[in-house]
Structure formats: C-alpha cells, structure tokens
Amino acid sequence: MGARKKISAEKRKEALKTMYFAKLQNVPTSPRKMRLVADMIRGMEVNRALGVLKFSSKEAAARVEKLLRSAIANWEQKNERKAESGELFVTQIFVDGGATLKRMRPAPQGRGYRIRKRSNHVTLFVGAKSNNEDQN
C-alpha cells in the first residue's frame, strides 16, 4: 500500500471511531415502504423514536426499531457508559435499494408479467445533536 493511501485509510479508520451507526442489509421490503418509516424518526431523540416505532402499524417499523436499539448499543459500547435520556438523536438515516429478485407471473395469451421482489439496505447513525444541526 502506498503512503498516501495508507494515510487516507488511517484517517477513515479514526473517523469511524467517532461515528455510531448500525446497518441492516437485504431487508425483504421495498425501499419505498421502508423510507416512510425512516422519515418518521429522522432527527428525533432516540427514546421518542423508539416509542414512535413501537406503536407504528407498519411492518418495517419493527425492523427499524431493532436497528435503532443496535445503534444505541454500539454508542454505549464505544463510550463505555449508558446513554442518558435526551442525549442521543437519530442524526442520519437512509434507505438504499438492494438486490431485486425477478419472478414471472403467468398472464393471458401465453405472456408472462415480471414481478420485482425488491429489497433494501438501511443505515442509521446516532449521536449528540450539535448547534450546527439545529440551525439547518
């Protein structure tokens, strides 16, 4: 590995030490449905977000709730202490499209309609809310 590449890799590694996130990959739900749930909790305090997800009727809410609990646990492990109420916020959450399974459904006159079974990847970041984020 070259010197510049090594320095860049070390910087990325150091930056990851201050990021607290969790990833959920290959979720068999369409990204559009998952984004509805992600939009509900974006920017919320984590305890309030857990409450919103718990009482949401959407199927994806249970998966995002589990992901949020994982991100909180990651924060607690890196900081070696429990998170206090009002301390952590969902700073970033985004949903990306995953692999699509393509299936055929029989249709009239010998045709076949394509069914796309979509999946997605969810990435959730938690952290303390800074003054810069409040102004945006």
Swiss-Prot record:
Protein encoded by which gene: rplV
Organism whose genome encodes this protein: Bacteroides thetaiotaomicron (strain ATCC 29148 / DSM 2079 / JCM 5827 / CCUG 10774 / NCTC 10582 / VPI-5482 / E50)
Cellular component terms per the entry's GO annotation: cytosolic large ribosomal subunit
Subunit structure: Part of the 50S ribosomal subunit.
NCBIfam families for this protein: rplV_bact
GO biological process, one term: translation
Highest taxon listed in the record's lineage: Bacteria
Keywords, alphabetical: Ribonucleoprotein, Ribosomal protein, RNA-binding, rRNA-binding
Recorded family membership: Belongs to the universal ribosomal protein uL22 family.
Function of the molecule: This protein binds specifically to 23S rRNA; its binding is stimulated by other ribosomal proteins, e.g. L4, L17, and L20. It is important during the early stages of 50S assembly. It makes multiple contacts with different domains of the 23S rRNA in the assembled 50S subunit and ribosome.
Official protein name in the record: Large ribosomal subunit protein uL22
Keyword Zinc: no
Cited Pfam families: Ribosomal_L22
Gene Ontology MF term list: rRNA binding; structural constituent of ribosome
